[in-house]
Amino acid sequence: KLLEQLGFVGYDGIIHWVIRKDCDCEEAVAVRESERKRLERQERRSQEEKLLRAGVARRYLNATVSRPESVRFIESFDVGVGAGLYYIGGVGAGKTSEASAVAKSFVWAGYSVVFATSLAMLDAIRASYDGKGGAGIDKFASADLLVLDDLGKENANSWALTTLFQVLNGRYENLLPTIFTSQYTIDALGRRMSRNGERESAQAIVSRIAQVSEVVNLGSADRRRGRQT
């Protein structure tokens, strides 16, 4: 199909012809559509890579926010306030999915986000002490948003609780928000962390969590199995 053309005289005195509008012939439309899809795939991969680098698991890349408390947290977020969320629920209640969905919003908004289980965080910090290239305390203590998944699964020894306190106290003092997920209420978490006699550290940790966290109870329904646990 012939295209409308526009001519102009350049400084060289020669008439230059340019296409006035995109060709709407079938072949050109197909090329443009193919390019649009390619750019969409490229952007999707880029967004996925950002989430994976932040620690969001591939299984939860498509997680969506389902709770009004999560929506409020996202919409009213102020990095200098330090308020966070504490998702509690049984196995399979959707804690990790909900926390991942919230984390996604902040990754895409350009905030530094670190998502890790408490076990993985402690392993990474220990590896940094052993010279194995793991992430040190500062990575977790200084991120704009930290998501600690499955809190209460970690060992309750002196090193683990002292390290956990260092991370959380650093965030507490610098008004940096933390999102927690756990099978335990905050009081039950304190008792669990005290099980090996580290009562003082346990109390210091749960006191800070209680002060800055809105508790969101996701119930006990196991979504993975479709039955009550």
Language-model segments: what does each one mean?
Residues G13, E75-S76, A135-I137, A141, ...:
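Short, flexible, glycine/charge-rich loop motifs used to bind or transfer phosphoryl groups or to couple energy/partner
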Residues G80-V81, A109, F140-A143, R171-L175:
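Short loop/turn elements that form and flank the Walker-type P-loop nucleotide-binding site
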